[in-house]
Amino acid sequence: MISFSSFYQQIADSNLQHWLETLPAILGRWQREHKHGNLPKWEKVLNKLHYPAPDQVDFVSSVTVGTGEQLTPGEKEKLENLLRLFMPWRKGPFHIHGIHIDTEWRSDWKWDRVSPHISPLQNRTVLDVGCGSGYHMWRMLGAGAKRVVGIDPSPLFLCQFEAVKRLSGENHPVHLLPLGIEELPPLDAFDTVFSMGVLYHRRSPIDHLLQLRDQLRMGGELVLETLVIDGDENAVLVPQDRYGKMNNVWFIPSVAALMLWLKKCDFTDIRCVDTDVTALAEQRRTDWMPNESLVEYLDPNDITKTIEGYPAPKRATIIAVKNQPNQDLT
């Protein structure tokens, strides 16, 4: 069974220690709820990942664990077969002992767009909300973060993350907890909070922004990346049914509207640092994710529109700073 005890030990003498009052019970309940289904099967695969400590790791320019020179061809083939049991791999890519996990998303492209604009992560405590399998968490560690905590309720993402962590050979200060942000108390403790690709999945975007604010220390930095549309501060797309075949997309604001929401939630120094239309080469079907991807979500006759006729995915990155809260919003 996946254990969170090392995380509890690491935060026992940190500014996250009061989280221990509720966190073990919440994670214990999550484990009980998932003791049937796929999680036990994936945990058995994790228990087979017994490999030597890697001869090289790189989290600065990629997520690379081992060169592959330590493994025989047979060992490498066995490892690849084990890692394929965690398919589909959506966020990456990862390079594990010479095995290239070519994920659906080129998450490294997003990191290259976002990272030049954020405050340096050196010695920062970081929260990544909706972290997926943890690709960006490793890049945050590579950028010098003191501790990185990711939250995502998916059992598969947790097991993909655990596979990379176990193969990395060290107990790195990077932890994925299978939680949604609504399960976090107001911690007021993180120096930087990332929410990338989450806001449009929330039924109440304002509540999500307030939840993000509650995790930041005063003066902490929010890095928010989400779908946007063109328009003024009153422009918000509410898809009638599906958006890009997704039935869980609720609100897609303009950049101006999103900045207004952040201001209303008592963020300051709000600035848009990047906008980018998602390219077909950034999100695509691969050997490690053989299901439908972006090209199937767009109008085959006009890729500037989704298959439903809405504007094709365009993403913006907004950076803001936590200010003294307005009591009317809390």
From Swiss-Prot:
Gene Ontology process terms (BP): tRNA wobble uridine modification
Residues bound to carboxy-S-adenosyl-L-methionine: K91, W105, K110, G130, D152, P153, S154, I181, E182, M196, Y200, R315
Name of encoding gene: cmoB
EC number: 2.5.1.-
Oxidoreductase recorded as keyword: no
Family classification: Belongs to the class I-like SAM-binding methyltransferase superfamily. CmoB family.
Organism: Shewanella sp. (strain MR-7)
Enzyme class: transferase
Keyword Nucleotide-binding: no
Top-rank taxon, per record: Bacteria
Protein name per UniProt: tRNA U34 carboxymethyltransferase
